[in-house]
Amino acid sequence: MSTFESLLARNEGLGQLFYQQMLEDPDAIAIVDGDYSLTYASLHAQATHLAQRLDQNDFVHEEPVGIVVQHGILDAVAQVAIIYAGGTCVTLDPALPNQQIERRLNRLRARYILVDTPNKSRGLPFSQIEVEDLPISTELIPTDSPYPVNLSLEHRSHLIHTSGTTSESKAVQIVGRSIVHVANYAPFEPVVKTDVVAHGNSTSFDVALFDIWAPLVQGASIAVLSKATLLDLSAFEAAIDRYKISVMAITAPLVNLAATTRPGMFSSMRVVLMGGEAVNIPAMRKIFEAGPPVHMVNAYGPTECCVYCLARKITLEDLDTGAVSIGKAIGNNIATVCDEMGKPVPDGEEGELLVGGPGVSPGYVNLPGKNAASFIEVPDLVDANGTPYHMYRTGDLVKRRPDGQYDFVGRFDHQVKIRGYRVELGAIETVLMDTGYFSEGVVMKVDSKAEGAGSALVAFAVLAPTAPPSAVTDATAALTAALPHYMIPNIHIVESIPLTNHAKVDRKQLADWCLQRQEKNMCAMQDKVPSEGASTRDQLGALWATILATPVREYSDNDDFFGLGGTSLQASLLISLIRRTFNTEVSLLALYDNSTLGQLAHIVDRNQGGALATVQNLREMWIADTMIGDALETPVGPVVDWRRDTEGRVFLTGATGFVGAFLLSDMLKMPGIHQVGCLVRAPDEATGVRRLRHALEKYNLWREEYLPKLLPLCGKLEDPWLGLGEQRFREIADWASVIFHLGALVNYTQPYSWHRPANIEGTVNVVRLACTGRSKALHYCSSISCFGPTGIINGTKVVHEDGALMPHLNALPYDHGYAQSQWVAEELLRRLIHRRFPIAVYRPGFITGHSETGACNPDDFFSRLIRACSSIGCYPGLPNQRKEFVPIDYVTSTMIHIASSSLSLGHAFHIVPPTREESPEMNDTMSLIGELTGTSIQPVSYREWIEQLSSTKDLSLQPLLPMLAEVVIDGMTRWEMYENMPTYENTNTLRALASCPDLPKFPMVDEALLRKYLDYLADH
């Protein structure tokens, strides 16, 4: 009896099988993503905790639960939790529009969704449970926990949507039996405990079932690979080596792409399963010449057969013959070829492939008609008990060889696979024609002749008589709004659609015409470029012509690579060709940032000229700097409760600054705080005390009774030992109960490099203090400026407190060095939080004066702005801009309250106005200031304001004038780029404050408060 048959006999579901692996080796790594990993025990604990939350409702057996979670560890946690509770996972691509997600879940009558932080504010109309990135101690899970619930292998574990637009998509039922079968036949031998299986496929793909569940039920490990990593071949190859990946399921186009520049990157692996498109023989030959994996497998399988059902181990003999079959049925699956009447056909004749066995789905949900047509019984095929097999009609035309292998011929219908996605061409045609711009339209998959470029969807369309000149652009926008990204075709306008002799669309003629045009375009462009002495622009144009099938004879500087239909795979190919042609590196991120021909030529020229300060170089430097804390050892032992009577010793940085002074004053007033050690730049303690005293006196905060509690610590952030010396550093590390890190260099005109020593290296040094000796919480004060102008650059509508920072990276080049340093410092801390460092992050908006006394910082930007605008009689009219004003006393009291609870650790908190209505726009604020000061300050254009500012004798804003006047992109300055600011979600903050109703309410910066500020500034 095989292992699979033994498991069938035991009939334990996926949850129990994972649980058994956890019991056998709880400390084994279950899943890793960068520096963040979960052991089997940790994954079990998190899944159990989430299952309990899910099961508090009237949860029923096989309840469909939507998963709207980004690719990574939390998605695996969500799936295990749902199965632990006895439900069914409905894996959904978070990139889908809300409308499509709603339709899919409503058709399943789903009531619940699991979401992560980036997706929790989408407003999806279902009962929502957040998958939190929190460590759950295994000790908190009772030994008599009901999870996982007892399930059989016939339990419906997943619903995978396949094919078509949302209204036409089919939800394929997957049962545990099918997944266990895949895990034990991968495809010729099982996944084993020593394997590391790559998880690079979207969880909306059935292939991701193999990525996640094959290792989990077999006791192996999962290594998460992002899409960006897969498309950056250098990073992809490094990830294989770093994680020691041994097994991977990958789409054929990615394999083909790797073959162009790194054909040997799979040589260390045990199994590589490729599918989605036909094997590219020249590309595969390169891989075999460079060193293939032990098993290079051409795998075939529609979703209805759970990942794959036929497979062929590719051999040199296959490559010599020029044809790689889709192999034979694997494991306990069976296959046959039938004619249109459902009767078997002889070997060598074309027919439809039918597949049966443990991998076949029970059918689609709520689609009895499609089930009757697609899932049938063949009387001549029976099992050992004489029962006819449940067979799936694949719709694929194949031929069976005498040795039992199957050769793929084509499709009965016009369903195709593009980059691993199955696409109904008719669904695209429907949306295309619904635009009303075309009288006829045909969508096809066309294979590109360019090396490694793969296939593309092309729509051939005849313009309607009333179509506007913008028909193609408008139609593309309509398609983008209605369909997933992989279903958006390149639209080619034709005079008529050719027909065959049988009055059917002549798809072959259309494909030939498209390829001829592509080849003609390539030749035309290449003929225009001399072999030597050609400009960078012309050489890049030739490279574009070898990749893109566009009707353009000569590209202009404003032509956009992606606007012309370039895909992410083609972008990777372009990067490789640029490297080969120009002997210079341009990263994928740089290409996305500079995707027009003119921009890209400029980037290539600058790289060749040795220019170092390009946007991409800066971004790579920032990313590298986020990793300088990775060598720090994770603190051990429980985190000190700093509010205990026997503790109360605070280490504070930045105490001489505006926020630090108010926070220090608040802490010195607290009876439970016994001493505050302040890191201060001073040659001796006496000078240090004077500096601290002066900082508090500046805002009328100093009290003589503070002196016994005040401990000056003379040092500096940039020094590894904080300027204290190693011995004193270790003494303070043991002395301190908690750390508040507010110290930073803040200069709006200096670059990142100037901020790096204090703000980045200094943060690492403070973290080192926190994890030296006793494990102490670190509370870090950042700013909402760490996101940069993400609203205008990324179109970000909402910034989540615990959301990923990486999506905002491409907004940072357009902000000042301080904001850039805050992003780096936060991402550095985020990496440490993932390693369970006890850290909390606080992001205030623009901090204004005290709500009672009016005491404010006369040197901050807002105070300088008030003085300058009052002097010149105008202010810049900036629509849709807010500063998110928060009074200083609200900021410090909020920080102290939140920091007093250990629940704050591992989270970020936006300290901003609680509601949008309490955050006035800048234009309204400046207008109100004019009324209160009795001056006539009028809104003017930003350019006019800068001109007025440049000629005034008022020096308030002169130090900031270079930053204010510098144009950074598209004619806009840094301040102008904060138009259409996102909402800074503050759920964590409001939840924490709700636990203490005695805290004062948020003091909105309104007319009364502005009057206090103006009075204070007038006296100072």
Curated annotation (Swiss-Prot):
Coiled-coil spans in chain: none
KW Transferase (keyword) present: no
Domain Carrier: 526-608
Keywords: Ligase, Multifunctional enzyme, Oxidoreductase, Phosphopantetheine, Phosphoprotein
Pathway: Secondary metabolite biosynthesis
Catalytic activity, EC: 6.3.2.-
Chain residue ranges for the region called short-chain dehydrogenase/reductase (R) domain: 652-894
First-tier enzyme category under EC: ligase
InterPro entries membership: ACP-like_sf, AMP-bd_C_sf, AMP-binding_CS, AMP-dep_synth/lig_dom, ANL_N_sf, Far_NAD-bd, NAD(P)-bd_dom_sf, PP-bd_ACP
GO molecular function: ligase activity; oxidoreductase activity
O-(pantetheine 4'-phosphoryl)serine: modified positions: 568
CDD domains in the record: A_NRPS, SDR_e1
NCBIfam families, per database record: Thioester-redct (TIGR01746)
Entry text on domains: NRP synthetases are composed of discrete domains (adenylation (A), thiolation (T) or peptidyl carrier protein (PCP) and condensation (C) domains) which when grouped together are referred to as a single module. Each module is responsible for the recognition (via the A domain) and incorporation of a single amino acid into the growing peptide product. Thus, an NRP synthetase is generally composed of one or more modules and can terminate in a thioesterase domain (TE) that releases the newly synthesized peptide from the enzyme.
Family classification: Belongs to the NRP synthetase family.
Stated name of the protein: Non-canonical nonribosomal peptide synthetase hkm10
